[in-house]
Amino acid sequence: MNPLDYIVQDRKRLPYGMMNFADIRCDNYYYVDKTRFIPMIEQADRFFFFIRPRRFGKSLTLNILQHYYDVSTRDKFDDLFGDLYIGQHPTPDRNSYLVLYLNFSGINAELNDYRKGLDEHCGTTIESFCKKYADLLPPETWEELHTKNGAVAQLEFLYQVCERAGQKMYLFIDEYDHFTNAILSNPESLRRYTDETHGEGYLRNLFNKVKAGTYFSIKRCFITGVNPVTMDDLTSGFNIGTNYSLSSKFNQLMGFTEEEVREMLNYYSTNSPFRHTVDELIEIMKPWYDNYCFAQDCYGETTMYNSNMVLYFVKNYIDNGKVPQNMIESNIRIDYEKLRMLIRKDKEFAHDASIIQTLVSQGYIIGDLKDGFPAVSITNPDNFVSLLYYFGMLTISGMHEGKTKLTIPNMVVQEQLYTYLLNTYNDTDLSFSSYEKSELSSALAYRGDWQSYFGYIADCLKRYASQRDKQKGEFFVHGFTLAMTAQNRFYRPISEQDTQAGYVDIFLCPMLEIYSDMTHSYIVELKYAKYKDPENRVEELRREAIAQANRYADTDTVKRAIGNTRLHKVVVVYKGMEMRVCEEVI
């Protein structure tokens, strides 16, 4: 197709990676209208805490609120909001605040050097604030500001000046929890972190000044981040803020609903060369980007797509006229580096079962989601489960025995989780050859060579298990096999696939939307016998697996997914850490 076919005049551009609301609205970008939530935020408590995973639109949401409430954007209201929900239903507080926006993401998170960065960022931001609103503040403000040293003193001065001038402030803090990274990556930092967030610590003092400012000119505050740890440490005794992260009213505030994704695709299908129907694109995107639920009451009603990943997909699809070969953008991979820290901490737990190992093998975990908890309590199982949830590693999937049931939301998270799980195995001197894995993956997809592929997995598993006896067992065998198959770019490994006939251990669903020429797909029935089981147990499991594989292969779910590929039914039986059976059911 001619590249010029992809250039369409007057077509709205996609705001991929953009966080400036005015640019989106004034430069003909596509915008999913979330302004209906502004009245709800305004009616909520004045000090609003909100936690969401990275790349879910937090910074853009704050920017929208800044433009809506900033007194300096009053003349631009119709241009920015006129045709949106809030433009038709404005609230009394619109364009009535002096806005102070602090973004901690660019500050050095090292606890031994963060004060300098915090002072510099706050100092620069407060100076800009004073210049911007010079006509609304006393004339001596600029000179007096420069007699104050450090973020704490300058913030105190600022809200006192605004109070004297009869002005009210709206304070926004983005990535307030940036400093938590230090304690996740380095346990030795915990003591220093505790010092800084308790007692007379500098970070604690800054938030104490925020609290004090609420008795002066700080009338509203909106604070966002990705985890509740710092919130609990910094705001114990705050007593003025409310955490709305688990509120059903704000489940759809960030991210896209499927209806919003469909509306976007419908718009671009009318002005771009689409090779798929909207339904087909939804079917491709849904397993990768959907299935986030942020409120127990919303389970079964509405799930959310990761908005950044949707924009990445649609932009690449329009630019190249086909489904992107890499369904995960590189920035997401960088963000998930925190998983390496979490998995390392998970391995240090005193309780018997590794939470992540259980999640991978069982397919779900249960726990009570916490609004917040101190850093010293991260290793409490429920707190760790909550941390995984807030980071976007888990999603609400109903109730189980009176507790919240949580599962891996989608393939983006699953791939990252399995990748870093394998990386922790690498930490124990088990090395995986990338070239060898790539060659075996290609042979599996295009030549039907399943013996070499599963033999390689069994060899790696046996070598690893000999180094870490504690991990022996059915959960480990199943989890390790899943993690290895997740590295295969040609398949979407689905564990415990719910079909009309029951559950299948691993269905290697071919990614035909990307690799249309691949020719083989697989159902893998994986069985495990304990070391001490009698030898005839292996044969019993083999026969059981054959019967199950035959039933699964005949389901509509599998038939629809495999397209024209040849379906292999592979039975694998382990006894302990040794693979005793690996055969195809003919």
Residue map of PLM features:
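Substrate-engagement module of ASCE P-loop NTPases
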Residues: F157-A165, R192-K219
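Walker A/P-loop-proximal flanking segment of P-loop NTPase domains
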Residues: N2-D70, D78-G87
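Conserved P-loop NTPase mechanochemical-coupling segment
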Residues: Y16-M19, Y101-A151, F179-T194
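Structural recognition of the conserved hydrophobic beta-strand(s) that form the central parallel beta-sheet
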Residues: F172-D174, R204-N205, K219-V226
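Amphipathic alpha-helical segments of the small helical/lid subdomains adjacent to P-loop NTPase cores
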Residues: T230-S236, Y244-K315
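P-loop NTPase motor core
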Residues: D33, H67-K131
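Extended alpha-helical interface modules used as scaffolds for assembling large macromolecular complexes
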Residues: G241, G300-A547, R551-A553, V581-I586
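Domain-level recognition of nuclease-like catalytic cores that cleave nucleotide substrates
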Residues: T557-I586
